[in-house]
């Protein structure tokens, strides 16, 4: 499974990249706005740090506007992936952009049929939102499992990005379900490698070694 970092914080991206865990980055208008810097400046800096795909989202709602924006975004760096909302106009834009060789990430997917439509239109990535489905009492993980099955059934090339990941369980279940990618907020990463029993074990090892060293010294 590939890990994308769901943030536009350059310091956060640098810190987690040093661990060798970042395969790509996803952003959206909300995330970009939090940085208080020009959109282009932020995306270009992220692309200079991360070799993998960096998703940058269009703002327009009509296909022509999305395509126009996407062409500009794609010129910012070779690893830019254009994020497109899951709408009829979005599908039209994806179809056009795919023909031009511009990679796309169709976002805000909540049903298998939406994911299938995006994949058929030529999306490079499709992003089902787990946490938001859970928020309305639906099991988002069922969507991941069923989407993976449908893509495999028909040999569709789109990769599933498990998005709106809220906790470790989301990540682990998405991995078990065969999602290609998980995009994870920076705040969740430390919880993925930490466990109180690990800390307790290290403490015990050090305590035993200290006792052994003192004994040897005597």
Curated annotation (Swiss-Prot):
GO terms classed as biological process: carbohydrate metabolic process; pentose-phosphate shunt
Catalytic residues (positions): 83 (schiff-base intermediate with substrate)
CDD domains associated with the record: Transaldolase_FSA
Keywords assigned: Cytoplasm, Pentose shunt, Schiff base, Transferase
Keyword Cytoplasm: yes
NCBIfam families: fsa_talC_mipB (TIGR00875)
Membership in a protein family: Belongs to the transaldolase family. Type 3B subfamily.
Name of the molecule in the record: Probable transaldolase 2
Classification lineage: Bacteria, Bacillati, Bacillota, Bacilli, Bacillales
């Amino acid at each position: 499974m590939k890990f994308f970092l769901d943030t536009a914080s350059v310091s956060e991206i640098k810190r987690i990249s040093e661990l060798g865990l970042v395969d790509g980055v996803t952003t959206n208008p909300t995330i970009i706005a939090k940085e208080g810097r020009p959109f282009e400046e932020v995306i270009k800096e992220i692309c200079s740090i991360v070799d993998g795909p960096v998703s940058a989202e269009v703002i327009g709602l009509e296909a022509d506007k999305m395509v126009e924006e996407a062409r500009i975004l794609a010129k910012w760096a070779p690893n830019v992936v254009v994020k497109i909302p899951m709408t009829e106009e979005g599908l039209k834009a994806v179809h056009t952009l795919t023909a031009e060789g511009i990679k796309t990430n169709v976002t805000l997917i909540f049903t298998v049929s939406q994911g299938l439509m995006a994949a058929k239109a030529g999306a490079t990535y499709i992003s089902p939102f787990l946490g938001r489905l859970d928020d309305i009492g639906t099991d988002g993980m069922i969507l991941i499992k069923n989407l993976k099955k449908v893509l495999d059934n028909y040999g569709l090339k789109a990769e599933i990005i498990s998005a709106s990941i809220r906790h470790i369980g989301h990540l682990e279940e998405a991995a078990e379900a065969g999602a290609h990618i998980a995009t994870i907020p920076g705040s969740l990463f430390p919880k993925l490698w930490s466990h109180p029993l690990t800390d307790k074990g290290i403490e015990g090892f050090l305590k035993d070694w200290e006792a052994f060293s003192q004994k040897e010294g005597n």
